[in-house]
Amino acid sequence: MSRRNCWICKMCRDESKRPPSNLTLEEVLQWAQSFENLMATKYGPVVYAAYLKMEHSDENIQFWMACETYKKIASRWSRISRAKKLYKIYIQPQSPREINIDSSTRETIIRNIQEPTETCFEEAQKIVYMHMERDSYPRFLKSEMYQKLLKTMQSNNSF
């Protein structure tokens, strides 16, 4: 999603872009209750990813979402191909979108990459989730993006 086409980015730039009609105030309020709530809703991960992209730190959410998709791959060959792609983009040392994981987790992935299972990236995904929950999620809740969306939803709800 490019910044030019992102509805949340346009809304933050005071353009006349409205949130999707099926995004509710209740959902936006749920995001502030817990990181788990944010990630479990339809639009939460999308808005959070847009925020992280604006911060130039979206590799964690992109990796997390890619892992969610990866876990659903049934075909062995597709899984192997996708696992190698995930490794090259996010796990390989010095890769442009390298995520911050410990060497033990990285080594386990390297050992399992030739015959990857659905859970091959599970530990790395948990680590990334924890980083997001502790670091960028509190900043997101205080961000102009979230505050503006919340205010817009509240004013739309008062009609």
Curated annotation (Swiss-Prot):
SUPFAM superfamilies, sorted: Regulator of G-protein signaling, RGS
Keywords: Signal transduction inhibitor
GO biological process terms on file: G protein-coupled receptor signaling pathway; negative regulation of G protein-coupled receptor signaling pathway
Protein name, UniProt field: Regulator of G-protein signaling 13
UniProt source species: Homo sapiens (Human)
GO molecular function: GTPase activity
InterPro entries: RGS, RGS_sf, RGS_subdom1/3, RGS_subdomain_2
Biological role stated in the UniProt entry: Inhibits signal transduction by increasing the GTPase activity of G protein alpha subunits thereby driving them into their inactive GDP-bound form. Binds to both G(i)-alpha and G(q)-alpha.
Top-level taxon in the UniProt lineage: Eukaryota
Annotated GO CC locations: cytosol; nucleus; plasma membrane
Residue ranges of domain RGS in the record: 34-150
